[in-house]
């Protein structure tokens, strides 16, 4: 017996991140009935330092004045970089080259701005091809199904018939938390100049970034081998540079490796 769908749409977009929400907005503005489904409820956290370039904001047609109302939009006009055993280097630009955002705010803003209908907190568990369309979760019928779920998109996973191409695994640990003005000043981090500390083997880097009343500290590497040791190494380098003091270090509770975000990236 053919299941009876409880909902229909012209386009079903799987994944409510910036890619999915931007596509949904364009399709909705073209007059299509678009439904976005995502396994997470929004706002949700995303392991990411959280900055976007002016070119991205322009492509998204994002009104900076509107977005900055009650949200973090931190101009970035320079970078401070360092590698263990070498002096730090500071680079400055005459105008903002990027903007710091909080992903929980940024992604939610784009998703709700899209104008699409939303089914959040719901995973895609089944997809059946029938009658020239798709039946998803035995509940949603659509003629067009789009996977926008990133590296672990369920659409890509379910439809892939060939072995996946060799990929480079990138893992990251990150924390973002509210901090007082005194704590941010104590870090010695200028909000307009994020700090980068590269691993000695140059296979990854850590960062310390102040934006609004928040600090974002993290590290990403090409592989997970001894990730915690590399995190500690970068933390000590930043502490020696007085980029985050002892009392702040005690507030940082790094996620376990099993909680770290893993990104699969095809080197080709």
Where does each model-flagged region fall?
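Conserved N-terminal helical subregion
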Residues: 65-68, 75-158, 166-170
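N-terminal Rossmann-fold NAD(P) dinucleotide-binding loop
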Residues: 20-21
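Beta1/beta-strand and adjacent pyrophosphate-binding region of the FAD-binding site
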Residues: 2-17
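N-terminal FAD cofactor-binding segment of flavoenzymes
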Residues: 43-80
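Conserved FAD-binding catalytic core of PHBH/FMO-like flavoproteins
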Residues: 152-235
């Amino acid at each position: 017996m053919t299941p009876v769908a409880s909902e229909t749409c012209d386009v079903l977009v799987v994944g409510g991140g910036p890619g999915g929400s931007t596509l949904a907005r364009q399709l909705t503005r073209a007059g299509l009935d678009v439904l976005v489904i995502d396994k997470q409820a929004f706002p949700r956290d995303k392991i990411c330092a959280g900055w976007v370039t002016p070119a991205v904001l322009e492509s998204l047609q994002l009104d900076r004045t509107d977005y900055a109302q009650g949200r973090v939009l931190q101009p970035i006009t320079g970078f401070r970089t360092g590698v263990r055993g070498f002096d730090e280097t500071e680079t400055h630009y005459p105008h903002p080259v990027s903007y710091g955002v909080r992903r929980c705010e940024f992604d939610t803003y784009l998703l709700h701005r899209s104008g699409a209908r939303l089914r959040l907190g719901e995973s895609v568990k089944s997809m059946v091809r029938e009658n020239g369309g798709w039946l998803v979760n035995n509940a949603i019928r659509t003629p067009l199904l789009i996977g926008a779920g990133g590296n672990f998109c369920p659409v890509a996973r379910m439809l892939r018939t060939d072995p996946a191409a060799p990929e480079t695994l990138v893992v990251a640990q990150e924390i973002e938390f509210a901090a007082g003005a005194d704590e941010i000043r104590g870090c010695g981090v200028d909000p307009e100049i994020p700090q980068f500390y590269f691993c000695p083997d140059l296979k990854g880097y850590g960062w310390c970034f102040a934006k609004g009343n928040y600090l974002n500290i993290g590290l990403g590497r090409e592989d997970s081998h001894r990730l915690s040791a590399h995190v500690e190494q970068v933390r000590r380098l930043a502490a020696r540079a007085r980029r985050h003091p002892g009392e702040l270090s005690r507030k940082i509770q790094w996620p376990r490796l099993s909680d770290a975000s893993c990104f699969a990236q095809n080197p080709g």
